[in-house]
Amino acid sequence: MYKERSGGGGGGSSRSEILGGAIDRKRINDALNKKLEKSSTSTTTSRVFSSKDKDPFSFTSTKTQLPDVESETDSEGSDVSGSEGDDTSWISWFCNLRGNDFFCEVDEDYIQDDFNLCGLSGQVPYYDYALDLILDVDASNSEMFTDEQHEMVESAAEMLYGLIHVRYILTTKGMAAMTEKYKNCDFGRCPRVFCCGQSCLPVGQSDIPRSSTVKIYCPKCEDISYPRSKFQGNIDGAYFGTTFPHLFLMTYGNLKPQKPTQSYVPKIFGFKVHKP
């Protein structure tokens, strides 16, 4: 692919180091944002979510040679550069990265249908290169890329996959894939005591990329909370959207639990606290 895939031996960062340590996505996106500052009039965005990060990338990509970008950091193993072996697809590898448990594997036939990708080319930098990376298509001029350019393409591929994913999970196949994860409690359980460990669903508070991180929605108490894992807590909420959990429960009504019958009652020395 765009970068030599790291194996279990040899030099450089191993897969275990990448999966076991803190994923260095901020550094990759800082480089991508610097490129956007130089090449586009779009609003500069950061990978760190804040109140001013409201606009998605407004950058139209064309498949031309990428200009050189100065690197401010040493070259390190990327978390989205490719799979360990040629027999593993990029999609499978990406979904199995630590912290990406919420993602399901999007069918490649779905990605190859241009209709399903309508409007995404204007939101994702280096769209063509990112799409090739996701589909494991070798680029003829990928060997000309610098490490910094590789990282920017890889970051764009992560963003593109997330924006495709939020559409896919609203389809019949996508919901079926998410059903298995829901039944296995892959999205976590509600921390509320009276929900008794109810399995949750991922939800975004906004459909705009880089506005907020993903949360988990409890269909029992109908409230949201933060994921327990710090890795999952860094995922963009727009990759799951505001619609998914509610459409999912409408589609699979048999999976919707009953409302909790108990609620906590505050007491002082055994007496209920008066509510004014």
From Swiss-Prot:
Subcellular location per the Swiss-Prot or TrEMBL entry: Cytoplasm, Cytosol; Nucleus
Molecular functions (GO terms): protein kinase regulator activity
Residue segments, region Disordered: 1-22, 34-86
Annotated Gene Ontology cellular component terms: cytosol; nucleus; protein kinase CK2 complex
Post-translational modification: Phosphorylated by alpha subunit.
Keywords: Cytoplasm, Nucleus, Phosphoprotein
Matches recorded under Pfam families: CK_II_beta (PF01214)
GO BP term (any one): regulation of circadian rhythm
Function: Plays a complex role in regulating the basal catalytic activity of the alpha subunit. The tetrameric holoenzyme CK2, composed of two alpha and two beta subunits, phosphorylates the transcription factor PIF1 after an exposure to light, resulting in a proteasome-dependent degradation of PIF1 and promotion of photomorphogenesis. CK2 phosphorylates translation initiation factors. May participate in the regulation of the initiation of translation. Stimulates the binding of CCA1 to promoters.
Family (UniProt): Belongs to the casein kinase 2 subunit beta family.
Known partners and oligomeric status: Heterotetramer of two catalytic alpha subunits and two regulatory beta subunits. Interacts with CCA1. Interacts with LHY.
Protein name per Swiss-Prot or TrEMBL: Casein kinase II subunit beta-3
Gene name tied to this protein: CKB3
